[in-house]
Amino acid sequence: MDRIAQQYRNGKRDNNGNRMASSAISEKGHIQVNQTRTPGQMPVYRGETINLSNLPQNQIKPCKDLDDVNIRRNNSNRHSKILLLDLCAGPNTNSFLGNTNAKDITVLSLPLPSTLVKRSNYPFENLLKNYLGSDEKYIEFTKIIKDYDIFIFSDSFSRISSCLKTTFCLIEKFKKFICHFFPSPYLKFFLLEGSLNDSKAPSLGKNKKNCILPKLDLNLNVNLTSRSTLNLRINIPPPNDSNKIFLQSLKKDLIHYSPNSLQKFFQFNMPADLAPNDTILPNWLKFCSVKENEKVILKKLFNNFETLENFEMQRLEKCLKFKKKPLHQKQLSQKQRGPQSTDDSKLYSLTSLQRQYKSSLKSNIQKNQKLKLIIPKNNTSSSPSPLSSDDTIMSPINDYELTEGIQSFTKNRYSNILPYEHSRVKLPHSPKPPAVSEASTTETKTDKSYPMCPVDAKNHSCKPNDYINANYLKLTQINPDFKYIATQAPLPSTMDDFWKVITLNKVKVIISLNSDDELNLRKWDIYWNNLSYSNHTIKLQNTWENICNINGCVLRVFQVKKTAPQNDNISQDCDLPHNGDLTSITMAVSEPFIVYQLQYKNWLDSCGVDMNDIIKLHKVKNSLLFNPQSFITSLEKDVCKPDLIDDNNSELHLDTANSSPLLVHCSAGCGRTGVFVTLDFLLSILSPTTNHSNKIDVWNMTQDLIFIIVNELRKQRISMVQNLTQYIACYEALLNYFALQKQIKNALPC
């Protein structure tokens, strides 16, 4: 406005002192661009204008008022219906019918956004859908508009010699829309010159009563039920609907299939070596072994996955409604709630499964000891012992929160994958991120493709932050021995935090499920041999490609050491916690320790996986967890030994209870990560060498164990096993596992 005022003060004036309009010619010689000036006062900036009379084959005709005889003149006796489009965007510029006798003219208020109107690649149908807000109103609009063949445009300013560019663009798009969808030889387009308020009332011949009276109307709607009016009211959704929009943004990768389309997009692959209801299978998996029931199997898995999605939506809704209670109120409510009881309406109850398993174990012990000792009567009928504190669900159903993940959005690789508060990994308070070196600056600049990633570490606040996008996973009600950390692929700005998680939790094995092709897609970043971290020293000691004949599997051996941060990394303006001691926000320098990384490159995002490779990965992972020296020695001697841990050796009891957590990541840390954790946990609790801490009968139960595991994992991290393809792959993979077990069993000598 200052620039316009300066032009006004310095511009030419006529003999009466009025401001004269200055004109300029655009790059297209036939378009004259005029800057609008208001005589005798401060100019009102309306944007550039176009002289339509200079355009070749211009089909837009001028009309002085709504009584212009040219509007209704045609070469036939056909009665034409007229639609007046009021393009004024101001609150007092809408017109309406002042007299219902004017049945041949309909007034429609259409204040479309000028930014979208001027986009050449944004057609009128998209403008209309965006303005109306629903496909139903768009369809209704097209049904009504097809009856009109004369269209008058009014923006209360434009003339043929000086038409606003926004109005011109809208008219051109509207003409293309009408001529394409509703072609007619009687189509006419007029521009009403001047304001509707300045236009005299049309007489429509000698009958002065039949008129359209331009009148200001503050409402943005006209009644759809009237013959001569259109309703384009935009209904603003109630506040509760905004929650649904937010939840849909978290589940934006979800694709819904109909039961009839399952056969078109999916097929369920069953190994040929398995017989229907094969005895080698657990009871709950036998329904997937009947080849003739492929449609039924797919439909059941589809329904189960939809149920999982509905459960997750309910949890996310609780994130929006949850109000954190004080600690004393939470403890009081837990005491009042008392022990958890079995609800028959639930799809499954882990507590009930535990009681059944304990009862069966007790019965077996009694049978085995019946000949050796006499069991007192008062013990034979005793009820099962109460569950320990470890048996309780990790998070009560009302305690789901995503607050820290939303607040620390710059540390998330994806905006819709956030960690739950009750299970997220919390770091000790960190100081301000280090100054960016030349090498790290290069890494950071390449990460601009991520909207959630900070472009520069200097932009970080010096406020201590314990956040990392990672969750602890532990299914204590099934088997408490196996612990996982699911996380996203670290960003350049969070690599120090990533290695801090490893050092704090004494992680020995990292499972990386990213392919090299995803590096170009910026789905992950190399977090070793990288200068984006400063508080850790990572030394790559050795690398093996395609280990144990697993194509695309790389084993890397890292030596990890925590180092003291530089003093200049901590700003003097930062508030140190506690007593201001640096040790309260930093880690002490540690002795170097070994971390193994297994990277599997042949698992593309949102796709299935070769179960043979997963079984080998599972065994290699166990070897690195429980017997790393022997396994590394065999690799150094170029001897492939993926079976250092024999699943059939029931005498071999691994120290699973004291094992370190397994850190698993893909890109987002939920899809492929969820599938691997599900399968790894299943293979562990089904193997006699690692299932000695099972709390439920994983063989004889009738409830679907994969459904249970995925649901329990989703209680701890969002979107674990992210889509239907991955969910079906879990069942196919487990069937392949038992088919391989059957082959091994049949190959053994009798």
UniProtKB/Swiss-Prot annotation:
GO terms for molecular function: protein tyrosine phosphatase activity. One of its GO terms (cellular component) is cytoplasm. GO terms for biological process: cellular hyperosmotic response; fungal-type cell wall organization or biogenesis; maintenance of protein location in nucleus; negative regulation of cell integrity MAPK cascade; pheromone response MAPK cascade; regulation of sporulation; signal transduction. The active site is at C666 (phosphocysteine intermediate). CDD domains: PTP_fungal. The keyword Cytoplasm applies. Pfam families: Y_phosphatase (PF00102). It is found in: Cytoplasm; Nucleus. It is an enzyme of class 3 (hydrolase). It comes from the Eukaryota. Its EC number is 3.1.3.48. InterPro entries: Prot-tyrosine_phosphatase-like, Protein-Tyr_Phosphatase, PTP_cat, Tyr_Pase_AS, Tyr_Pase_cat, Tyr_Pase_dom. SMART domains: PTPc (SM00194), PTPc_motif (SM00404). This is Tyrosine-protein phosphatase 2. The gene is PTP2.
